[in-house]
Amino acid sequence: MRRLPVFFVLDCSESMLGEPLQHMQQGVQQVMQHLRQDPYALETVYVSVIAFAGIVRTLVPLVEAFAFYPPPLPLGSGSHLGAALEHLMDEFDRYLIKTTEEVKGDWKPIVYLLTDGHPTDRCDNAIYRWQKRYARRCTLIAVGLGNSVDFVTLRKLTENIVSFEHLNEEGFKKFFQWISASVLSQSKSIGDGVEQNPMLPLDERYLQIVKDVQRHQGVDENCVTFVGRCGKLNRPYLMKFDKELQYASEEVSAIK
């Protein structure tokens, strides 16, 4: 049976601290629960999870859906997207089965790249390598979380860019339901011997296709994260501050 590889490449930088990281971890578990209930997915889908911050690590190598065990997502400083791309391409070379005269290889892999900010390393060489050797060999869906995403860089990787700004429990639930439905639809179609576009229609209350990357550029003014170091133990720690909006009464806020 030919495999359908699915890679989750997840930004676990300090800006994801708190509920966003928890919701992302729960979302991956939600996807796997849906996949395990589908006979087509159980036969074809193989899943890998790669986390990146200042370093990149494979948390789960490419495994069958029924054997997948959801890992705890780490948290780190920095967002090395270039290193994450290099790591992903190395994983492709190491684990994907190519079609030869003797054997049919894997179906076209699907990659879900989730990031909420700007790269903190140089991406040019990784992007060049990606476009030259890998971009046509897989479907990369880049998802920008929040309102401070570098969509210009993501556009250099793929035309499939999704903006997801509702980083609450309900928003994450809808988002990962969309991923589940997309993977299930693709696994069923290849079960019938046909590959289709894994991008299903979006629920535009939560998700939007990004066409004009310049218009979506921005900086999150409602959150700031600091990296500190303990003076006693000399160990790093993170501090995240969210702006709490204070709404004044009409009388106070009226223009005089």
Predicted ranges, named:
Residues 1-60, 67-107, 110-114, 121-122, ...:
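Von Willebrand factor
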Residues 39-40, 131-138:
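Arginine/glycine-rich "motif VI" loop of SF2 helicases in the C-terminal RecA-like domain
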Residues 147-207:
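Von Willebrand factor A/integrin I-like adhesion domains
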Residues 214-225:
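Short, flexible, mixed-charge glycine/proline-rich loop motifs
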Residues 227-233:
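Short cysteine-rich clusters marking metal-coordination/redox-active sites
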Residues 234-239:
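Cys/His-rich microdomains that often coordinate metals
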Residues 240-248:
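Short cysteine/histidine-rich zinc-coordinating motifs and their immediately flanking basic loops
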